[in-house]
């Protein structure tokens, strides 16, 4: 229906739609085009749920502007005002609130590991849990900003692994400055924890390509790493799942480059260092 407009000047998620324009002078033309499309399909909009000429607003629970994506202040406030959990149900509530903000949190699983441990045995709010809870609130005292990707630009991916977690940071570059686009991570389970380091890196890449599929489909994604991940995945003697991951990742325009600048190496080291420390 909006095949020509989506990702150009329209973003759609289920029944939520945004018509966006970089230049104010183009906005009326974009609106007219989209209204004509709606009319051609005899579709109507609810005026009470429409807003026009908005420079910043809430979309899918986030505050979105031309330059940044902010955490919804209401979601931050809900965490900041929470008292330390007193039982498993309250820990589950805390984990649920954090899960809605995953994309804004570097190393979410590492930060929340003490909370998960309380769910495995009889409830006990330990000193480690208290420290993690305080650290989480401190993190949100200066809400992080994410930068929306631009059509056609390269995006850069940093991978980090530990014994039990893989972490991924997707960033873009603007005027020589790298800005985060999305953070994601995944706890390793069962046999995944026993993967050799190179297989964990490959698994981190596949995890990212699945979680961030829309970015991988729309952009060239550059993996900034000094590890020979592609060679390991395409090695005929590698484990069977490595070959499958190689095939899966080949569907996207993925490139591999070493960290050549100081800022790239600093960021890569920062992510890796704290992943291992907390893992």
Residues of each region from the PLM?
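Retroelement reverse transcriptase polymerase core
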Residues: 1-223, 228-239, 244-245, 261-263
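C-terminal functional segments of enzyme domains
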Residues: 240, 254-257, 261-279
